[in-house]
């Protein structure tokens, strides 16, 4: 989005609560890789020089790639700025954005928060059952899991390393 806005000469800023791609770095499991191979999961004008075209880049490399791309574009990224509230203005166009560093007035806002901001657990297992439930946002590797049977809902990226562990 920033690339296209910049190319059209539209002034904008990108606010990042922490570093660029922080969730890739610290809020995902150890074995996470991109959803596609390097030849496919890339942006125009920036290839993965150190990753083979058919390799699915690991999360650390993806995070660095996003940083490299922002730098290449000279994108107006402000890191360490938390957006606390976005409110549509009442009697005038635009929005008031309240951040950890003050207030920003904007005509338009693009909310690109990414998925899964708040972990959700299926309401199947009673809390006092003694069964460990671990959301993917807290999962790092199979070493966190108790011995015994495991049920993984939806994530092959977590299921496969868990299966290999036994």
Residue ranges: model-predicted function:
Residues 17, 153-156:
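Glycine-rich Rossmann-fold phosphate-binding loop(s) that bind the pyrophosphate
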Residues 6-27:
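Glycine-rich FAD pyrophosphate-binding loop
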Residues 60-77:
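Helical element adjacent to the flavin cofactor pocket in flavoenzyme catalytic cores
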Residues 1, 148-153:
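Beta1/beta-strand and adjacent pyrophosphate-binding region of the FAD-binding site
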Residues 42-59, 85, 94-96, 143-149:
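Helix-loop-beta segment of a Rossmann-like dinucleotide-binding subdomain
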Residues 22-63:
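Glycine-rich active-site loop/strand segments that organize a redox cofactor
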Residues 24, 72-146:
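FAD-binding core/adjacent interface of flavoenzyme oxidoreductases
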Residues 156-166:
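Single conserved hydrophobic/aromatic residue that forms the stacking wall/gate
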């Amino acid at each position: 989005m920033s690339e296209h806005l910049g190319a059209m000469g539209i002034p904008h800023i990108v606010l990042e609560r922490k570093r660029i791609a922080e969730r890739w770095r610290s809020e995902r499991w150890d074995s996470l890789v991109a959803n596609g191979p390097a030849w496919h999961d890339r942006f125009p004008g920036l290839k993965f020089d150190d990753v083979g075209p058919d390799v699915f880049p690991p999360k650390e490399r993806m995070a660095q790639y996003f940083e490299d791309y922002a730098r290449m574009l000279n994108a107006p990224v402000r890191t360490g700025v938390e957006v606390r509230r976005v409110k549509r203005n009442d009697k005038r166009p635009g929005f008031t954005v309240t951040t950890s560093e003050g207030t920003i007035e904007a005509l338009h806002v693009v909310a690109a928060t990414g998925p899964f901001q708040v972990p959700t657990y299926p309401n199947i297992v009673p809390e006092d059952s003694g069964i460990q439930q671990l959301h993917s946002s807290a999962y790092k590797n199979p070493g966190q899991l108790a011995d015994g049977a495991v049920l993984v809902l939806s994530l092959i990226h977590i299921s496969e390393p868990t299966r290999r562990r036994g």
